[in-house]
Structure formats: C-alpha cells, structure tokens
From Swiss-Prot:
Signal peptide annotation: none
Naturally occurring in which organism (per UniProt): Clostridium beijerinckii (strain ATCC 51743 / NCIMB 8052)
Root EC class: transferase
Similarity comment: Belongs to the radical SAM superfamily. Biotin synthase family.
Residues holding [2Fe-2S] cluster: S104, C136, C196, R266
Record protein name field: Biotin synthase
C-alpha cells in the first residue's frame, strides 16, 4: 500500500480498468496510513468545515428509502415551509463566528421553485453581502437558469449526492434515477459551480458499489465528497438495518482517498458512532467534515471538533 500511495502522490490515478480487489483485503492500518500520507502530501494540513441549515423540511415527493423527509414514509419530523431569510442570515453569521468555512441551505423536495427559490436567492444575496463564508446550496433538480442565478447570488458550490452506485440506485430510490443525478451535477458544473457529491454507506450495498461510487465521482471531477453512514430513522424502510462497523467506515474513507486523492473527503453523518468524534477518520484520509447537526439527526459540536482537529495537527 505504501508503494501505491507513492505512485498516486506522483500522479497515478485509479480507474475502472484497474483490479481494485486488493483494497478490500489489504491490512486496514496499512491502507489508512497510506491514505493519510496521500492526504498530507496532496492536500496539506488544512481542514474544511461546513455546516447546513434545513431550509425547508419534510413533505418531499421523492421516495429515497433512507430519508425521514419523504412523504412516502411515516416519520416524526418537523415539517415547515421555507425559512425567513433573516433567520438563515442570523444562523450563518453565528456559524461564521464559530470558524466554519462553508454554509449551505438544504431544502427537502424534488426541486426548489417559485417563491421558495426566490427566497433562497434572497438569503444567499444577504449572506454574500454580510458574511465572508463560502456559500453552498442543495435544492434538488434545478434548471440551468436557476444554477446561474445561484452563482450570481454568491453560491460557489452545489451539493447533489449520487447516494450509491449506478447499479444499486434503483434499490434506494425509484422516483428519480441515477442518470437524473448525473445530469444535475453536469448542469451545475456548466454554470460555473463547483460540486459537492457523495453518498451514504451502510444501506445494504456491497463493497463494489462503494468503489464504483468513488470512481464515478472521480470521473465527474467532484471536488468535495461527503461520506454519510446510514443512521436508521424510525418509519423509513431502512429503519431496521444493522449499522456497519467503524472498521468498515475507516476502510471506506481510505478507499475514497486513494481513488480521489485531491478531493475533500468530507465525513458527514455517522461520526457520532465514534466515541472520540472520529479521530481515526482524520487519520485515514479525511480532510473535511460537516460540523454541527445534520438535517434530521444529531451531529458533532463545532467547538469540540475544532479542538480535536487542531490536536491532530490540522489548521482551521
């Protein structure tokens, strides 16, 4: 693994034509150490912190099996319309003061349209004017014109998870397709936005699905890859799935670093499964994280995250 890490540092890139079976069987410590070396050499010691606000909750038409916000599932989440832009601005300012680097509004639903989209643009313009934080957005399937409007409002990155591999996608969602996701990502890129896209592990997929997802993201040129671990929510079709081990989480992080050596490998939901906040995650190739709460689940405390990461040698 050390030799492969050196080759990747020197420019080699893993592709679909490579036999990647060894990534699943090699010693865990060796693959994690190699991934950490790649991260340190190609990405440096800086860490990227982002946080999100649930800008519109619930009542989603899509049937993603993992999601508590779908109208297809009976869950006990708060449902509300788009937040007042002033509420969003206040929350953004608070997170910027806490040292967070990126801030994103995330909305439930297939797409954000009409007056809700107008409110989102207004909120981004207000944040762009009054804050210095990097602005990200996650609003489902938008038109090319909408992506341009977001960019003009100050948004620099668009979030659109592919969730899993192409071959496994139909097992997770049937109201939209994997190809719909890819089209969305390319529209955002064509509008001049960077893209944040990853997925969820622990939904019953195989290791080959995870590798396939990592390669697809590399082929798309995605620069920020959030990796979520399924946190089963009562009322969703996946509520009774047994969670994957911490060892599997670490191997997944390392594999994604080997395949996407210069990207932000962003640990998202699931870090609370680690008692120490996920120290080993950041020694296995990760150099970014969502801090604070997730959309419908509890996350990690930002101040504690900063202390932990600085102790590990990262610069905030």
């Amino acid at each position: 693994m050390e030799k492969l890490a050196e080759e990747i540092i020197n420019g080699r890139r893993l592709t679909r034509s490579d036999d990647l079976e060894f990534l699943l069987t090699c010693d865990l410590k060796k693959i994690c150490d190699g991934a950490n070396k790649i991260r340190k050499t190609l990405c440096g010691e800086s860490v990227d912190l982002c946080t999100i606000i649930n800008g519109r909750s619930g009542k989603c038409s899509e049937n993603c099996k993992f999601c508590a916000q779908s109208n297809h599932h009976k869950t006990e989440i708060k449902k509300y319309d788009f937040l007042d832009p002033n509420v969003i601005l206040k929350d953004c300012k608070k997170n910027e003061a806490n040292g967070v680097h990126r801030y994103s509004i995330v909305t439930a639903g297939r797409a954000l349209v009409g007056s809700d989209f107008d409110k989102a643009v207004q909120a981004y313009k207000m944040m762009n004017k009054e804050c210095s934080i990097n602005l990200c957005a996650s609003h489902g399937f938008l038109s090319e014109e909408q992506f341009v409007l977001l960019k003009e409002a100050g948004v620099t990155m668009y979030h659109a998870n592919i969730e899993t591999s192409k071959r496994n996608f139909h097992n997770i969602c049937t109201t939209h397709s994997y190809d719909d996701k890819i089209k969305e990502i390319k529209l955002a890129q064509n509008a001049g936005l960077k893209v944040c896209s990853g997925g969820i592990i622990g939904m019953g997929e195989t290791w080959y699905d995870r590798i396939d997802m990592a390669i697809s993201l590399s082929e798309l040129g995605v620069i920020s890859i959030p990796i979520n671990v399924l946190m089963p929510i009562k009322g969703t079709p996946l509520e009774n799935l047994k969670r994957i081990s911490n060892y599997d989480i670490l191997r997944t992080i390392a594999i994604f670093r080997y395949i996407n050596p210069t990207a932000y490998i962003r640990m998202a939901a699931g870090r609370t499964y680690f008692e120490d906040g996920g120290i080993e995650i950041f020694q296995s190739g990760s150099n970014a994280t969502i801090t604070g709460d997730m959309l419908t689940t509890v996350g990690n405390n930002t101040c504690q995250d900063k202390i932990m990461l600085q102790t590990l040698g990262f610069s905030i």
